[in-house]
């Protein structure tokens, strides 16, 4: 597995890996993570991956983290 890049954006850690002819985009926030697998054949240049760190896609990642966090917190309160 090759690390393509790692950085933080808006408090979310973003890691990009190349593995088994796929790019793995991993977003982490606290105890939660979201991972997306993209076939390398769908990406002409690694810079094409930048579209996954901005705009509507990234906004939905952030929104999903909020929803996940609320569900997780409710479940912890029910323990």
Predicted features and spans:
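Short amphipathic beta-strand/extended segments with alternating polar/hydrophobic composition
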Residues: 33-41
